[in-house]
């Protein structure tokens, strides 16, 4: 029965951040195919990963568990291996690959976004990603952190649950999002955003 903490000072955040990274090294989801270099090699901090595979994975993981999304991602990448292939596909072909994954507007938005992205460099900012259909702050932050090693916080349901427990906060209501974003940012290790 601890008191909830409203603000995370640097002194309070550093040991929590370290503990989270230690936990991640032991129990985290390493080895996800979109977070590896070709050949299955983990990236060095200066390595850029393929933004396309990460983007597809992050959209599939919106409201969908990893165990469900992973086989869909593998099939998707076999059929649409590049943003150009996705943009050139018919919407019916895209929907067919998405069939069974649910939340079908995600497939339509991926297709729309692919058509906007073709011929342009990948976005390197939150604003650039969030300008695309179906991309919010958490998805944009996750893509930028994973693909480009940019230190940006995320705040999905899992992160909220962990933060609520760490900070002795009652079940997180939506109106506390600003507080939870501040905690997520305070706990982010700028040297290890992936």
Named regions from a protein language model:
Residues 5-9:
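Extended, low-hydrophobicity segments enriched in charged/polar residues
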Residues 13-19:
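N-terminal, positively charged, Ser/Thr/Ala/Gly-biased leader segments
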Residues 2, 22-194:
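Catalytic cores of DNA base-excision repair glycosylases
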